[in-house]
């Protein structure tokens, strides 16, 4: 309050000085106003501080500065020079672009960023910049100078000084030093304002100046603050800050400011009355400067709060009403800038110093809307009213003037203001705003207790609850309270319950799914999924069964292998072959075609049992279907077991041998996979003469068209080359499936015995590991199957190697006597090459093949690659592990 009072008193002196200086300054500054505008823009900010600090000194400095123009004014009367210079500059620039001080020219568009800052700055700056004395000085300077530059400079300096005298100009000029005190007191936001904000304010002031130039002298007052703004945004900003500070203080002590403003403003007012002519005169001689000067004058008037006062009535008005002067200031701004909406808007910020807060917000807009002094006065009244309700008034003022409705009271945003005044309304009367806020808070607090009371059951006594403890506990624990708070609790409880229910449902569904998976999940699942899972399930089933039956099978296989080995050594293949190929012999009568047809079935059975069987089939020309069968086996492990039925079929001696040698295994497989099982094999054997029948039957019996097709293809191959099969069977199928064609039962019998002994081994291990290692049937046949069956597998491998050698012989030879395998190899040197043909994939290019054969070749490739990889991985990994174990330090 003391600061404000001192400001007013100092402001009065300053304004008087400014007036005197204004008279003096205009002459010197006339030539220099344009340069000062440049310098003021740069250096106005700092000079303002001195102006504020020393009312007289700054005045004097301002006068000299006004004379030098841009250079001197920025320092001492920076606000004045800045306003004038900036007004000219900014006015020109702002006229070019959107007015950024919240005062938007009718044809201008304000950038959203500048709107708030400009509004705030203008609200703060316009009152500070536009002191009555400054206005008068500006007007007088304009008149005397006859040049817009001189008038603008003097007015700007005068306005700055008068503003400081009013506590606005000096506060603004000393905003650097005194912005915290006088400036901050004038404008609580002054500290917050940035030079950029000032720039926007300057731009706004420039806009105002353009309107002011077109408008009345009050506009020239405003123009002076814009000039300061243009001169140095910091300076104008300081002025604005003082104004902005003043608005907060002005709410605190609006009367002191009005008083101080009034005294200084009276001079201002007298000069304010001049400003109208000045703007008019400057407009004619120098429209740009005239408008700027009018803006400065308006600014000076606004700070005084008698922006209206600038008019004789407005002078009395500021004294009468502090808020009205603010609104009055804004009004004079609008009156001065009546032509320029932006002008009035900016002036309210300038007038903001004390009343300027009010005038800045609604007053400015209202005044803006009122483009004449009368309108300003009317706006003054409105300004007071608006001051009382700055927010509402700001909106009202904006509503009064459509152009002014671009700024919002709270954030000064031009878009959401819906005709809200500039920043002035919020900043101009902080006391009223605070009171409103307090009242609102009080109402809310009252409403809250009412709500609490309703919760408690008694709206008036929310804290008191007469319910029993049990009731209270129930209420607290209840999930469905009817009270508002309880409603929230009930909501939460409901949400929790829903979540729990959802969780339970999800868990139940998951459990059901798991149960279905474990028990009958396949049934609900689509047939495709079931089929996909079927192989794995069958593999597990077969593996478990094989493991359980392993010992029995091993013993049986060992016996059969021993018999077959002895038979091979003694070259007594008939017995072994008969045993191993009882069904094979049956097929032999059925001819190669029949045997070949059965072979596919056997291959299907044996391949699932032992990967070696597909290999042996591969060895045979028609054995290619065996790999397809193996493929089927891979996708459908149960089919392999199903194929077990065909083993009785004699398609491949090895397979038949396996089945005969390991009848239990074949039976087990049969039991596990009864689909293709015996029916398929039996039917195939029965229908051996016709491959088509065999194929169709395996499909129907086995229920797996793939295998039946492959079998059929194999049968077709065998039928196509029945003669080759007799030798090819001995050689090609010598490895595993030496299908002793009916033509060559003796030769085939020996390999068949060995194959039967070895292949049963293969078959048993193969069927067991085969399902497990379906990916690499060859490897499983040779290595994994026999390795899995150390005893029986070895015997089998020996027999197979002796008879079949190449495919199964390799793993068999590795597992058991290589000598026997060598003997068999010697016997089957030709079959060795055939083994490569069988096991190694053939070039599919340029070769005519069935789809089944092609699938077999693909399967061979797959098996070969997988087998190699598996072997390499095992060897390398085991070696590394062993090395690491032996040398733990190295391993580490």
Curated annotation (Swiss-Prot):
Spans of biased composition, class Basic and acidic residues?
Answer: 56-65
- Compositional bias (Polar residues): 587-597, 610-621
Main localization, broad class? cytoplasm
Which InterPro entries does this chain map to?
FAM193, FAM193_C
Coiled coil, from the record:
485-517
Location within or outside the cell:
Cytoplasm; Nucleus
Modified positions (Phosphoserine) in chain numbering:
764, 776, 882
Q: Which GO terms describe its cellular component?
A: cytoplasm; nucleus
Region Disordered, as annotated, extends over 1-78, 164-192, 237-321, 379-403, 587-655, 671-837
Record keywords: Coiled coil, Cytoplasm, Nucleus, Phosphoprotein
Q: Does the keyword Signal apply?
A: no
Name the residue ranges with Pro residues bias: 28-37, 248-258, 274-285, 309-321, 637-650
Bias type Low complexity, positions: 169-185, 391-400, 736-757
Where are stretches of biased composition, namely Acidic residues? 379-388
Report the superkingdom from the record.
Eukaryota
| Family the entry assigns | Belongs to the FAM193 family.
Protein name (database record): Protein FAM193B
């Amino acid at each position: 309050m003391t600061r404000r009072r001192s400001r007013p008193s100092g402001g009065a002196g300053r304004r008087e000085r400014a007036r005197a200086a204004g008279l003096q300054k205009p002459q010197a500054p006339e030539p220099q106003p344009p340069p000062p505008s440049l310098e003021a823009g740069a250096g106005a900010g700092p000079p303002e501080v001195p102006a504020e600090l020393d009312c007289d000194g700054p005045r004097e400095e301002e006068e000299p500065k006004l004379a030098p123009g841009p250079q001197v004014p920025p320092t001492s009367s920076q606000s004045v020079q800045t306003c004038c210079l900036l007004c000219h500059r900014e006015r020109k620039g702002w006229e070019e672009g959107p007015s950024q001080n919240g005062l938007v020219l009718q044809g201008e568009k304000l950038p959203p960023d500048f709107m708030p800052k400009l509004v705030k700055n203008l609200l703060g700056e316009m009152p500070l910049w536009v002191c009555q004395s400054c206005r008068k000085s500006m007007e007088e300077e304009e008149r005397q100078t006859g040049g817009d530059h001189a008038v603008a400079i003097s007015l700007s300096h005068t306005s700055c000084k008068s503003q400081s005298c009013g506590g606005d100009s000096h506060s603004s000029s000393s905003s650097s030093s005194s912005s915290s005190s006088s400036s901050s007191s004038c404008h609580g936001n002054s500290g917050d304002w940035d030079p950029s904000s000032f720039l926007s304010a300057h731009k706004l002031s420039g806009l105002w100046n353009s309107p002011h130039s077109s408008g009345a002298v009050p506009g020239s007052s405003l123009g002076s603050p814009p000039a300061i703004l243009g001169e140095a945004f910091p300076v104008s900003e300081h002025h604005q800050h003082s104004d902005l500070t003043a608005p907060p203080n002005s709410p605190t002590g609006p009367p002191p400011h009005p008083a101080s403003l009034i005294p200084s403003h009276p001079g201002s007012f007298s000069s304010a009355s001049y400003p109208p002519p000045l703007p008019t005169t400057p407009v004619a001689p120098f429209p740009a400067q005239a408008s700027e000067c009018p803006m400065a004058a308006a600014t000076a008037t606004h700070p005084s709060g008698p922006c209206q006062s600038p008019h004789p009535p407005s002078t009395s008005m500021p004294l009468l009403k502090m808020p009205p002067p603010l609104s009055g200031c804004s009004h004079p701004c609008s009156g001065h800038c009546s032509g320029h909406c932006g002008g009035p808007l900016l002036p309210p910020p300038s007038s903001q110093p004390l009343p300027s807060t009010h005038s800045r917000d609604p007053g400015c807009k209202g005044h803006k809307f009122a483009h004449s002094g009368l309108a300003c006065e009317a706006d003054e009244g409105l300004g007071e009213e608006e001051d009382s309700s700055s927010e509402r008034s700001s909106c009202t003022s904006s509503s009064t003037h459509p152009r002014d409705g671009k700024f919002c009271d709270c954030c000064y945003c031009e878009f959401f203001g819906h005709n809200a005044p500039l920043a002035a309304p919020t900043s101009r009367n902080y006391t009223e705003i605070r009171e409103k806020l307090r009242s609102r808070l009080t109402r809310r607090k009252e409403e809250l207790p009412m709500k609490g009371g309703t919760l408690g059951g008694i709206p008036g006594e929310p804290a008191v609850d007469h319910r029993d403890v049990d009731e209270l506990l129930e209420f607290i624990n209840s999930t469905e309270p009817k009270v508002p708070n309880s409603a929230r609790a009930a909501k939460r409880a409901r949400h929790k319950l829903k979540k729990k229910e959802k969780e339970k449902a999800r868990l139940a569904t998951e459990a059901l799914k798991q149960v279905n998976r474990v028990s009958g999940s396949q049934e609900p699942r689509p047939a495709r999924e079931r089929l996909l899972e079927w192989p794995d399930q069958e593999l597990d089933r077969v593996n478990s069964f094989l493991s359980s039956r392993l010992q029995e099978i091993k013993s049986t296989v060992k016996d059969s292998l021993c018999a077959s080995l002895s038979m091979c050594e003694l070259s007594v293949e008939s017995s072994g072959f008969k045993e191993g190929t009882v069904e094979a012999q049956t097929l032999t009568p059925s001819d190669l075609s029949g045997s070949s047809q059965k072979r596919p079935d056997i291959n299907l059975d044996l391949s699932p049992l032992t990967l070696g069987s597909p290999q042996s089939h591969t060895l045979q020309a028609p054995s290619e279907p065996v790999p397809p069968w193996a493929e089927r086996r891979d996708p459908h492990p149960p089919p392999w077991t199903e194929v077990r039925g065909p083993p009785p079929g004699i398609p491949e001696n090895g397979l038949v041998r396996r089945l005969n040698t390991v009848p239990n295994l074949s039976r087990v497989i049969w039991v596990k996979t009864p689909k293709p099982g015996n029916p398929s094999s039996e039917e195939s054997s029965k229908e051996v003469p016709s491959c088509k029948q065999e194929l169709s039957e395996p499909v129907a019996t086995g229920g797996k068209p793939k295998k039946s097709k492959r079998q059929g293809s194999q049968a077709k191959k065998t039928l196509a080359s029945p003669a080759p099969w007799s030798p090819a069977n001995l050689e090609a199928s010598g490895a595993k499936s030496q299908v002793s064609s009916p033509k060559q039962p003796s030769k085939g019998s020996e390999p068949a015995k060995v194959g039967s002994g070895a292949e049963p081994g293969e078959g048993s291990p193969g069927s067991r590991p085969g399902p497990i290692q379906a990916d690499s049937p060859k490897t499983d046949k040779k290595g994994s199957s026999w390795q899995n069956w150390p005893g029986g597998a070895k015997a089998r491998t020996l027999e197979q190697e002796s008879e079949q050698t190449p495919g199964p012989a390799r793993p068999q030879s590795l597992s058991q006597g290589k000598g026997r395998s060598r003997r068999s190899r010697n016997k089957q040197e030709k079959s060795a090459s055939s083994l490569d043909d069988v096991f190694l994939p053939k070039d599919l290019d340029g070769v005519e093949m069935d789809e089944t054969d092609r699938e077999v070749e693909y399967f061979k490739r797959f098996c070969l690659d997988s087998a190699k990889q598996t072997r390499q991985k095992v060897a390398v990994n085991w070696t590394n592990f062993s090395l690491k174990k032996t040398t733990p330090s190295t391993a580490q």
